[in-house]
UniProtKB/Swiss-Prot annotation:
Provenance organism: Zea mays
GO biological process: defense response to fungus; host-mediated perturbation of symbiont process
Glycosylation positions in this chain: 59
Protein name (record): Kiwellin-1
Source lineage: Eukaryota, Viridiplantae, Streptophyta, Embryophyta, Tracheophyta
GO molecular function: enzyme inhibitor activity
Signal peptide start and end residues: 1-32
Places the protein is found: Secreted, Extracellular space, Apoplast
Family from the record: Belongs to the kiwellin family.
Gene that encodes it: KWL1
Length: 198
């Protein structure tokens, strides 16, 4: 039968190394818990007040409502070899629901082109401009698409953004050609996907 003194000795053996690890700061803690980055999340950076306007609802776009508050983000979830995202539908054509010309090129793109816009954090100040990403759908289909624009998570509800709210922080906004190549139903408006840099 264990004694009280024996129990105290056992607690000391277990607790002291843990306490030493915690007291030696973040560097030691990262060795004790190497998956700490998985706990980091992208938090909202603020909000904007909605303003309605001439919103093109061609692809089921959500239009801003006067006075409503919309969350903004300056970040996106961490990029991995298979980053989870929500694919939304967007026309990059002139007069389409995409608003202004593509940020990367200053051009519009016909709906037959496989192009995408990425949420602000993934767009990363334009570092992915004119680069291809590989998109994988749950049905097993994949497509390579060119990054041409930012799906802005920091602003919205204005003419440049088709009077739509700021993008969520986990969006890959794909052209109709991307949806067709993936064999997805455009009437759904959004789909769960994964993507990776090529």
């Amino acid at each position: 039968m264990a004694t009280v003194g024996g129990n105290r000795a056992l607690y000391a053996v277990v607790a002291l190394p843990l306490l030493a690890t915690l007291l030696h700061g973040p560097m030691r803690l990262s060795h004790a818990f190497p998956y700490r980055s998985l706990l980091q999340t992208c938090q909202p950076s603020g909000s904007i007040q909605g303003r309605s306007g001439n919103c093109n609802t061609e692809n089921g776009s959500e239009c801003c409502k006067n006075g409503r508050r919309y969350t903004t983000y300056g970040c996106s979830p961490p990029v991995t070899g298979s980053t989870r995202a929500v694919l939304t539908l967007n026309s990059f054509a002139e007069g389409g629901d995409g608003g202004g010309a593509a940020a990367c090129t200053g051009k519009f793109y016909d709906d037959s082109k496989k192009v995408v816009a990425l949420s602000t954090g993934w767009y990363n100040g334009g570092s992915r401009c004119r680069k291809h990403i590989m998109i994988h759908a749950g049905n097993g289909n994949s497509v390579s698409a060119l990054v041409v624009d930012e799906c802005d998570s920091t602003v919205g509800c204005d003419k440049d953004h088709n009077f739509e709210p700021p993008c969520r922080n986990n969006i890959v906004d794909g052209s109709p050609a991307v949806w067709d190549a993936l064999g997805l139903n455009k009437d759904d408006g959004q789909a769960q996907i994964t993507w990776s840099d090529e």
